[in-house]
C-alpha cells in the first residue's frame, strides 16, 4: 500500500520545476496586466473604490495588505514588489521564499477587488501556496545552475497538487450534468455569444456537429479526472493520456473564449504531472542531466524510486499541506452539496477557507444560458435624448428592444467586472461602476457621460437565451443621478443628500438611511424658495409637514400618518 501511494502521488522534481517557471510567468503576466489597470480598478478614485472591498468583507473577515492603505503610491508599490518576487520565482532564486511572498501578495490583491475574482485566480493562488512546500528550486534554477537531475518526490503537498486538479475537474463535471451539456448544445450556446467567444470560437459555430462532439468530450474528460490522474494501474502511462488531454482541453478553451488566466494557469499546473519518462525524450531531455529510471516509466508499476520531499521541517510542512488539502476538499464537498440540494452549509467553513484563499467555486460554464448577457447603460442627456453609451453616442431608436450586439470592452477585466455585477453577490459594485462612466467609458470608442452632458443613468441587463431575454425583459441593475450629491453605503444612498435639477438648482435636501428617506427633508421651487418641509420615517412622510408657494407664502400645514 505504501508503494502504491508513493507511485500515485509522487511527482518528478523536474516537472515541479516546470510548474514553478510556468506559474511565475503567469503571475508576472497577470501582475503586469493588473498594473495596466491600476488607475481603473485599484486607485482611490477607480471604478472599484477602497470602500467596496471594506463593505464586501464587513461580515466575512479577511486579510489583505492592499486594504491597509488606499494611497495610490502604496498600491503601486505592492504591485512592483509582487513583480519582483515573481521574477525571483521564475529564475529559482530562493524559490520557496519567493513563492511564499508571491502567495501573500497575490492572495492580498484578490481581497482588494472582490468583483474581479475568477477561478483562474483561485487556482494560481493555490499553486503558489503548495509551491512553498515543494522542492521547486532543485532543478532549472539559479541554485541548481539550471541543471535538472532526475528524481521523484512525494508528500502531502504533491498529493494536494494532484487532488486540486482532480477536484476541479470532477466537481465541474458533476455540476454540468444538466440538459445543455448532456444534449451536447452547451458549447454552441456559449460560443454563439459574441461577448464571451473569441473569433475562432465564433467560427466554430458554423460546425454544430463538431461542437456537439467537443461538448461531450469536455464533459467526459472532467468526469474521469480521478482515473486519468490517479490511476494506480500503469500510473505514468495513463497519466500521460490525462496530461495531454487536459492540456488540449485548456488550449481549446483559451483560443475560443475569454477566460483571462484560467486556461494558462491550468496548463502550468498540469506541467507538474509530467511523468519521469517524458524527460528521456526531446525537447525535455535537453534540459536534464540524467535519464529517468523509474520502474513505472517503461515496464511495470510495482516499484518506485520516489523519496520524501526534502525540507528542514518535514512534519510542519506536511501538516500545513495536509491542512490545506483538508480545507479545499471540504469546501469542494460543501459547494457540491449546496449546488445539488440548495441547502447552504455553515458560513464558518468558507470563512476559514478564505483566509488561505481555498474558498474555490468550480461552476464555470455549468449553466450556459446564464452567461449570455446584454447590458444597456442608458443615459438621459440635458436635451432629452436617451443614449446607450456602451454602444453608441446616438439616441436609442427602440428603448424597449433587446440589443442584438454585445459590447466591445477595452479589456477582458472590464468585461469580467460587468458580468460579475449581475450577481447579487456584488450588488454594491454597481453604483461605483455607473459613477465611473462620468469620465471614463470602458467600451471601445464610446463617449463618457460628461461628453454627452448626461444627467441620469440606468444600467440594465437582459439574461438568458434570446427567447428568455425577449420574454422576461431587462432587470435594472442600478440607477445613478449625476446631478445629486451624497454618499452610499452597501449600494444604497446613505447620509446627507442634495438633489438638483438639470440646471443645477437644488430640488431637495435631507438624509437617507440605507436607501430610505429619514428625518427632516426640504423641497424647493425652481426659484430657490422652499416648497415643502417635514419629516420621513422608513421612507414615508411622517408627522407635521408645511408647504409654501413659489412666493414663499405658506399654503398648507398638517400631519402625515
What do the predicted segments below correspond to?
Residues 471-561:
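Glycine/tyrosine- and acidic-biased, solvent-exposed loop/turn segments at the edges of beta-strands
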Residues 1-483:
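Alpha-helical membrane-anchoring segments
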Amino acid at each position: 500500500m505504501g508503494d502504491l501511494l508513493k507511485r500515485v502521488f509522487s511527482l518528478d522534481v523536474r516537472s515541479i520545476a516546470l510548474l514553478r517557471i510556468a506559474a511565475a510567468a503567469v503571475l508576472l503576466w497577470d501582475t503586469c496586466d493588473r498594473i495596466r489597470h491600476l488607475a481603473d480598478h485599484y486607485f482611490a478614485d477607480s471604478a472599484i473604490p477602497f470602500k467596496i472591498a471594506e463593505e464586501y468583507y464587513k461580515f466575512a473577515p479577511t486579510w489583505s495588505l492592499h486594504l491597509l492603505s488606499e494611497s495610490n503610491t502604496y498600491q503601486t508599490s505592492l504591485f512592483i514588489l509582487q513583480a519582483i518576487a515573481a521574477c525571483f520565482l521564475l529564475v529559482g532564486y530562493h524559490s520557496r521564499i519567493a513563492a511564499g511572498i508571491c502567495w501573500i501578495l497575490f492572495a492580498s490583491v484578490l481581497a482588494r477587488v472582490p468583483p474581479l475574482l475568477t477561478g483562474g485566480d483561485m487556482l494560481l493562488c493555490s499553486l503558489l501556496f503548495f509551491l512553498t512546500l515543494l522542492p521547486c528550486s532543485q532543478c532549472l534554477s539559479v541554485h541548481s545552475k539550471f541543471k535538472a537531475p532526475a528524481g521523484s518526490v512525494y508528500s502531502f503537498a504533491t498529493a494536494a497538487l494532484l487532488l486540486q486538479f482532480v477536484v476541479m475537474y470532477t466537481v465541474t463535471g458533476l455540476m454540468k450534468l444538466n440538459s445543455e451539456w448532456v444534449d451536447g448544445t452547451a458549447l454552441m450556446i456559449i460560443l454563439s455569444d459574441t461577448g464571451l467567444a473569441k473569433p475562432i470560437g465564433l467560427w466554430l459555430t458554423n460546425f454544430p456537429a463538431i461542437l456537439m462532439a467537443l461538448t461531450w468530450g469536455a464533459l467526459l474528460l472532467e468526469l474521469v479526472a480521478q482515473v486519468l490522474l490517479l490511476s494506480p494501474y500503469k500510473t505514468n502511462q495513463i497519466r500521460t493520456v490525462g496530461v495531454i488531454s487536459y492540456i488540449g482541453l485548456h488550449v481549446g478553451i483559451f483560443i475560443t473564449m475569454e477566460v483571462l488566466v484560467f486556461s494558462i494557469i491550468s496548463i502550468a499546473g498540469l506541467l507538474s504531472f509530467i511523468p519521469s519518462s517524458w524527460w528521456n525524450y526531446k525537447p525535455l531531455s535537453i534540459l536534464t542531466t540524467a535519464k529517468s529510471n523509474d520502474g513505472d516509466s517503461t515496464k511495470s508499476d510495482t516499484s518506485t524510486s520516489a523519496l520524501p520531499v526534502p525540507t528542514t521541517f518535514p512534519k510542519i510542512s506536511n501538516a500545513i499541506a495536509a491542512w490545506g488539502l483538508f480545507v479545499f476538499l471540504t469546501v469542494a464537498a460543501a459547494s457540491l452539496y449546496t449546488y445539488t440540494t440548495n441547502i447552504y452549509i455553515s458560513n464558518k467553513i468558507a470563512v476559514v477557507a478564505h483566509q488561505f484563499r481555498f474558498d474555490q467555486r468550480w461552476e464555470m460554464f455549468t449553466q450556459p444560458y446564464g452567461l449570455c448577457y446584454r447590458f444597456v447603460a442608458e443615459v438621459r442627456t440635458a436635451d432629452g435624448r436617451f443614449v446607450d453609451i456602451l454602444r453608441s453616442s446616438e439616441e436609442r431608436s427602440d428603448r424597449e428592444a433587446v440589443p442584438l450586439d454585445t459590447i466591445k470592452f477595452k479589456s477582458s477585466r472590464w468585461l469580467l467586472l460587468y458580468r460579475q455585477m449581475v450577481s447579487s453577490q456584488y450588488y454594491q459594485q454597481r453604483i461605483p461602476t455607473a459613477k465611473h462612466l462620468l469620465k471614463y467609458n470602458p467600451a471601445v470608442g464610446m463617449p463618457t457621460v460628461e461628453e454627452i452632458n448626461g444627467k441620469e443613468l440606468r444600467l440594465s441587463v437582459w439574461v438568458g437565451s434570446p427567447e428568455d431575454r425577449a420574454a422576461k425583459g431587462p432587470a435594472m441593475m442600478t440607477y445613478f443621478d449625476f446631478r445629486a450629491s451624497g454618499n452610499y453605503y452597501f449600494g444604497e444612498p446613505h447620509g446627507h443628500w442634495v438633489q438638483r435639477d438639470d440646471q443645477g438648482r437644488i430640488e431637495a435636501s435631507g438624509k437617507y438611511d440605507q436607501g430610505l428617506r429619514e428625518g427632516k427633508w426640504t423641497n424647493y421651487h425652481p426659484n430657490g424658495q422652499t416648497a415643502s418641509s417635514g419629516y420621513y420615517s422608513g421612507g414615508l412622510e411622517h408627522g407635521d409637514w408645511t408647504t409654501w408657494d413659489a412666493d414663499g407664502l405658506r399654503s398648507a400645514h398638517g400631519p402625515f400618518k
